Swiss-Prot record:
One of its GO terms (molecular function) is argininosuccinate lyase activity. InterPro entries: Arg_succ_lyase_C, Argininosuccinate_lyase, Fumarase/histidase_N, Fumarate_lyase_CS, Fumarate_lyase_fam, Fumarate_lyase_N, L-Aspartase-like. Its EC number is 4.3.2.1. The keyword Amino-acid biosynthesis applies. Keywords: Amino-acid biosynthesis, Arginine biosynthesis, Cytoplasm, Lyase. PANTHER family: ARGININOSUCCINATE LYASE (PTHR43814:SF1). One of its GO terms (biological process) is L-arginine biosynthetic process. This is Argininosuccinate lyase. GO terms for cellular component: cytosol. Belongs to the lyase 1 family. Argininosuccinate lyase subfamily. It catalyses: 2-(N(omega)-L-arginino)succinate = fumarate + L-arginine. It comes from the Bacteria. It is found in: Cytoplasm.
Length: 461
């Protein structure tokens, strides 16, 4: 049987259908279509300008590619699994449109540098969109923090009340995490903004190509300077998957807290109906499903990172078919991250904060114990002695069923003559938060300064 593949000259027999289907990637790499056309347009312009092909041939190919791009944008293009991948589908469609001259498009180019170029263009585009969505989420956090500088809530360690803090302080912690995520993706963009086009199969080409020209036409800031490296590594995708894993870990932690906070046990926030669902059997339920889904999707993003690391770990240079497995995880991670960022911004901007419940929660615990120890230390008692005294008072209160602010002054003075009437003000949650004005602390003045720094940072983006 004759082999009609574009690479079929060396073969006497064709692939059987089920084998062909196993090897095909058009079922997912169709997403690279506009980038494949963009890369081909740059390549054919270079071929024409360098005289590698005749000007009229370059013009015919360019016109054909532009028509294919228009058909793609209008949703008219249909792909064939028999053509394996997006590159061979596009070449087949181009040949159908303009005839045999289409075969000159692949001069001085391999599918190896072609697919690498497509993925660099695709990921560069998506990184820009992710950067914008991260910027929006950070703005939402800043707006919410500005509303709640003086909203007092319990701060936790080991999921137990530790010290009272400002709710804004808690939100700004996530702002800082997401800011570092933005920086990581910006570095990722630098490593992605390089053109592999012209590396050919692995060793470059004998044709007098102009790689700087194609890089410039495609909007890349530079080129790969080693042809083997250009076609055989996928570290720019691994970096993206790694950065995405860190980002969705941060999102997952925030989701976990929101899920807890909207429960009856906490009651700190109420999520909008837009981001909640009900139960098919329990009429009273309002479930934080969207937050739970973001938390759950962290697993699939981690999985894509581990999958590609495993694919890459033993690959010899240069191209191997294993690299076909680099795309689906990248595509899915892009979708997951972009949707998760949109959902998280929506959840935060629409939720209701129960300030009173947060404050009351700080008054029904021992999170002011550190304040009492600090109070004694400031009066000259060694902190370790103060810590011991307060620990015993907490034990006493726990057994009796009351809190430190409920202890009468007479009992305090039995414990230490250093304790005076002003101890009760020191034990108030508001006082505890306001006094923590060390750099980076939860004091209101520190938070306002941090908000100003963050606003300047965002405005410079």
């Amino acid at each position: 049987m004759a082999n009609h593949k574009l690479w079929g000259g060396r073969f006497e027999a064709s692939l059987e259908g089920w084998v062909e289907e196993f090897g095909a990637s058009i079922g997912f790499d169709y997403r690279l279509a506009p980038y494949d056309l963009e890369g081909s347009l740059a390549h054919v312009k270079m071929l024409g300008q360098t005289g590698i092909i005749a000007p009229e041939e370059a013009a015919a190919i360019q016109a054909g590619l532009e028509k294919l791009l228009a058909r793609y944008e209008s949703g008219e293009l249909e792909f064939d699994v028999r053509n394996e991948d997006i590159h061979m589908n596009m070449e087949a469609l181009l040949t159908e449109k303009i005839g045999p001259v289409a075969g000159k498009l692949h001069t001085a180019r391999s599918r190896n540098d072609q697919v690498a170029t497509d993925m660099h263009l695709y990921l560069k585009d998506q990184l820009g969109q992710i950067a914008d969505k991260l910027l929006n989420l950070r703005q939402v956090l800043l707006d919410l923090a500005e509303e709640h500088v003086e909203t007092i809530m319990p701060g936790y360690t080991h999921l137990q009340h530790a010290q009272p803090i400002s709710f804004a302080h808690h939100l700004l912690a996530y702002y800082q995490m997401f800011s570092r995520d933005s920086q990581r993706f910006a570095f990722n963009l630098e490593h992605t903004d390089l053109s592999p086009l012209g590396a050919a199969a692995l060793a470059g080409t004998t044709f007098p190509i102009d790689r700087e020209l194609t890089a410039d036409l495609l909007g890349f800031k530079g080129i790969y300077h080693n042809s083997l490296d250009a076609v055989s590594d996928r570290d720019f995708i691994l970096e993206f998957l790694s950065n995405s894993s860190i980002l969705i870990m941060h999102l997952s932690r925030l989701c976990e807290e929101l899920i807890n906070w909207c429960s009856y046990e906490y009651g700190f926030v109420s999520l909008s109906d837009t981001f909640s669902t009900g139960s098919s059997i329990m009429p009273q339920k309002k479930n934080p499903d969207m937050a739970e889904l973001i938390r759950g999707k962290s697993g699939r993003v981690y999985g894509h990172l581990f999958s590609l690391l495993t694919v890459m770990k033993s690959l010899p240079l240069a191209y191997n078919k294993d690299l076909q497995e680099d795309k689906e995880g990248m595509f899915d991670t892009v979708d997951t991250i972009q949707k998760s960022l949109d959902i998280m911004a929506g959840i935060l901007s629409s939720m209701t904060v129960n300030k009173e419940k947060m404050l009351v929660s700080t008054q029904q615990d021992f999170s002011n114990a550190t304040e009492l120890a600090d109070y004694l230390a400031k009066k000259g008692l060694p902190f370790r002695e103060a810590h011991e005294i307060v620990g015993k008072l907490v034990l006493e209160c726990s057994k009796a069923g009351y809190y430190l602010q409920d202890i009468p002054l007479s009992r305090y003075q039995e414990v230490s003559s250093l304790i005076e009437e002003d101890v009760y003000q020191a034990l108030e949650s508001q006082t505890a938060v306001q006094k923590r004005n060390s750099l980076g602390g939860t004091g209101f003045e520190q938070i306002r300064q941090e908000l100003e720094r963050a606003k300047k940072d965002l405005n410079n983006k």
